[in-house]
Amino acid sequence: MITFDHVSHVFPNGTTALDDVSLHVEPHTTTVLLGTSGSGKTTLMRMVNRMLSPTSGRVIVRGQNVADIDPVKLRRSIGYVLQDAGLFPHRTIVDNIATVPRLEGASRRESAKRALELMDLVGLDRGLAKRYPAQLSGGQRQRVGVARALANEADILLMDEPFGALDPLVRADLQRELRDLRDRVGTTILFVTHDLDEAFMLGDQIAVLQTGGVLAQVGTSENLVTNPANDFVASFVGSSGQRRLSMKSTPAGTLISDPDGRPLGLLPEGELR
């Protein structure tokens, strides 16, 4: 679905943001770009929709080099969810969600019908349809953001730290709902985060980037914990030397804890990635 083929990017000031990154994202899966600030996560994501172009290498989406696709057409075929949701404050919730269908030529009635269906899909009460973003909680606004991202029936969803500003309980709920939504709809998700717990919860595969835009390792959560590729990955996942994460089977699934016994995440039974 998405392939980064030996992608590098150097900013005009000479700073290397990405250094020869190759990565493949399978259809209907979630790939998490995990790393510290300045590791190139968002830069890599922005190349999918041609917001940035590689200095060298290629980005392939749905079998085509994005350099050969009209950028407006490409961007309208992809859904986006950002940390601040990016909603129009002067528009109602239903109008926010209906933005893309309206741009694509759908009637107001058709767009509103689609928006209400998407509200159902992401767990938003239809009674909120005529409210404005400022009248919603942070978690509700993010649900609106997800609904709007799906409004154009996009098969690819780009998510840049969408839950980072939310409180832990709301964040955990949205993570579970996103995973369930992906399974129901079959969307391909590229998800940026610096949070290990979130990466383990959501990622079918996790791509760890380190400073300088170097792809340190790609694998499942189990791979990262049990077989880190280098000292950076070992340190990042807390498995350097004797500081190893633990995995314990429970009736609810596999519980991953840090070396001090603090739980990092729970992978439901059969979903150890």
Regions found by a protein language model. Give the residues of each.
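ABC ATPase NBD coupling module
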Residues: 65-79, 103-105, 109
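Conserved ABC ATPase signature
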Residues: 132-136, 140-142
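Hydrophobic anchor residue at the start of the ABC signature
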Residues: 146
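ABC ATPase C-loop
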Residues: 128, 149-150
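Helix-to-loop junction immediately C-terminal to a conserved catalytic motif
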Residues: 49
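Conserved ABC ATPase "signature" region
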Residues: 109-127
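Short helical segment in ABC ATPase nucleotide-binding domains corresponding to the A-loop/adjacent helical element
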Residues: 94-102, 112, 116
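A short, proline-enriched helix->beta-strand linker immediately N-terminal to the Walker B motif
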Residues: 151-155
